[in-house]
Amino acid sequence: CERMPKRLKETMIRSDFHMHTAFSTDSEEAVESMLNRAVERGLYSVCITDHMDADYPPDDEMGESAFRLDTENYFPFLLKKKKEYEERIQVRIGIELGLQKHLGTRYETLIEKYPFDFVIGSMHLVCGEDPYTGKVFEELGDAQVYRRMFCETLECIRKIKCFDVLGHLDYVVRYGKHQAEAYSYEKFSDEIDMILRELISSGKGLELNMAGIKYGLGFAHPHPSVLRRYKELGGEIITVGSDAHKAEHIGYEFEIAGELLKSCGFRYYTEFENRKAVFRRIP
């Protein structure tokens, strides 16, 4: 187990509720490697949330089956691992849905079919493109892409209700040409406030996704100003995820996640089991 300063270790969030394995198109990591690393990191619970992005635009590299989760094998395998690791760590079974406004019925059917513990709803496309490729930024400026993403997010969460938390709210900023220089809560407060109000009124939560720091943004998703606003508006449900696609990133920067949440007014973070929120006091 890696050694950390005692103060940080004692205040570390120990539940990682966003990670990907080889069941996701963009990860090659074995489930066992992820779970072993989580145990080494001292986590007491994790939720595996592999990708299901129906109607993800095909490309030459990934083909038409990109980000389609093999649920028929996913569930039996993870149930087996949950039992195998039960003396070492609590394993929850989740999924990350790539939201598009026309997918509500399809996703509802999927979620009703399997007893997931936790469902993340995330926006991975804007104007029909994954911002990861950079193409959409060639056509539109950063600010316009960001605004479109927030508007499309609002449309999706108004139409799709079969998720528990909204993942990495300002994810799109990672891939902008100017990244955070073109982004602040204040510049997009109208759009962001509508998203936050919709989540709260629908009983949905927000994710603190630590991967923004890994990608060099200097902040986790969403920006602390958005977290503070969510709390001001009455938001309480907040999960913490590394969004790890490799074992080495399990619990990424979780040593500072608790203090970040506290600085934004939170005293509890959230886990999910059987789709029910469980609140844990921040150390």
Language model regions located:
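Histidine/acidic residue-rich metal-binding segments in metalloenzymes
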Residues: D70-E84, Q90-R92, T109-P115, D142-V165, ...
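An N-terminally biased module of ancient metal coordination in phosphate/nucleic-acid-related enzymes
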Residues: P5-L97, K101, T105, L110-K113, ...
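Charged catalytic cores and adjacent phosphate/nucleic-acid-binding surfaces used
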Residues: P5-T21, V31, G42, C127, ...
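Surface-exposed cleft-lining segments at the edges of enzyme active sites
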Residues: Y132-V145, V173-S184
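Non-cysteine beta-strand/loop elements that form the S-adenosyl-L-methionine
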Residues: V46-H51, F116-V126, D164-Y171, E207
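Active-site rim beta-loop-alpha module in soluble metabolic enzymes
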Residues: H168-K177, G203
